[in-house]
Regions:
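Short glycine/proline- and aromatic-enriched beta-strand/turn motifs that initiate or cap beta-hairpins
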Residues: 25-98, 202
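Cleavable N-terminal export/targeting peptides
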Residues: 1-35
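Predominantly the C-terminal beta-signal and adjacent terminal strand-loop region
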Residues: 226-272
Length: 272
């Protein structure tokens, strides 16, 4: 798993920045104001991937394939969030771009045994997943205190995903499909509603707990997303780590039945 951030701040410099004296490190974005306020976040997402797709198993019999069965590691995904607020009203945009996948070679058991192979047969297999999720929402601040802010939100999310499975058998057994490929794709627009917020704590309000939750439907039977974690507010910006899950359920009769991404995030945020 590779970290997408190419520039690394030395730990000693980061510590020095975090320990700068000040009355309060809480950002202007989370304090009461009628001015325009902006926040941009850049972070990496390191998810495990699960789900089910339908592929032919050497004939007409459908086969449910768990995406996580083929993935022993994933590439990190790029993620960015932009927020704007004036008074209690605001806007929220989040984009996630993922290119995930792995392969196995010489295995006797493809997909954890869900695709049975004849005796003496081995296989090479690969699974590639490309996905982009874009969330757009309007926000309204329902709670605003010196330590806590909570927004309700309503909007839409787009998921554009493709899953490609390839396999090659190394057996000459009659009736065995030597090579195969199956690709399913899905574009889904769904309406969502949710809430997000931050709570600061510590002597100078330098620590905070960020959280986010939404759910909706549309082209998908159900989509939901949730995240929570901890962060540190410095004078130059914020550092935060969360656990995030993005889940889609398209129904049992779809080629792409469901797909989910869950794992840690690590990033920075800047307010102005």
């Amino acid at each position: 798993m590779s970290l997408p951030l190419r520039r690394v701040i030395p730990a000693s410099h980061l510590l020095a920045l975090c320990l700068l004296p000040g009355v309060s490190f809480a950002s202007d974005f989370d304090t009461p104001s009628d001015d325009w306020n902006f926040r941009a976040s850049l972070y990496g997402f390191f998810p495990d991937v699960g789900g089910n797709v339908r592929v032919p198993s050497g004939g007409e019999r459908p086969l449910d394939v768990s995406a996580s069965d083929l993935i022993s590691h994933t590439d990190a995904a790029a993620m960015a969030t932009f927020e704007v607020r004036k008074g209690r009203w605001g806007g929220y945009a989040d984009i996630v771009s993922m290119d995930l996948g792995d392969s196995v070679h010489g295995t006797r058991s493809i997909l954890a045994g869900r695709m049975p192979l004849p005796p003496g047969t081995s296989a090479d297999a690969s699974l590639d997943i490309e996905a982009t999720a874009l969330t757009l929402a309007g926000t309204y601040r329902v709670l605003e205190t010196p330590n806590t802010s909570i927004d309700v939100l309503a909007g839409a999310r787009l998921l554009d995903a493709s899953v490609e499975l390839k396999w090659t058998f190394s057996s000459d057994v009659v009736g065995t499909l030597r090579t195969g490929r199956n690709e399913v794709s899905r574009t889904s627009w769904d309406g969502i509603v949710g809430m997000k917020g931050r709570t600061y704590f510590g002597g100078r309000r330098q620590w905070f707990v960020p959280w986010y939750v939404d759910a909706g439907t549309g082209a998908a039977d159900l989509t939901w997303q949730a995240s929570a974690g901890i962060g540190y507010a410095a004078k130059w910006g914020d550092v935060f780590a969360t656990w995030r899950r993005l889940d889609y359920d398209f129904g049992a009769d779809r080629h792409l039945g469901d797909i989910d991404f869950s794992g840690p995030t690590l990033g920075v945020a800047f307010d102005w």
